[in-house]
Amino acid sequence: MIPPDAKHSSRKQSERATEIIAHEAAQFIAREAGTESLITVIRAQSIAHGDRMNIFVSVFPVEKARAALAFLERQRESFSKHLKEHTHLRLPRIDFLLDNGEGVGEYPKS
């Protein structure tokens, strides 16, 4: 059985890693994205015991959401490299999702 303190410590580490990845994603996007749209990191969510990380973004203007997510998908490997260079975290698989304003992520409609 895992002691209660270990569970709390593990959850706190996971939350901290999620915050760091969200912050690094915001910095990376600000540096790499063009000026056609404004891409803002809303939050990150760790799933599958930290093996995957969903990064929720908003895009303005909304009409540029598909292009922005396509850009982020193309930059996924570069972002992983950025994380490796700037953090000492175990690297999860990163997925970028559009935040629909209700705390739920969605892929852009085709």
Please provide the spans of the model-predicted regions.
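Charge-rich, low-complexity N-terminal segments
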Residues: M1-S110
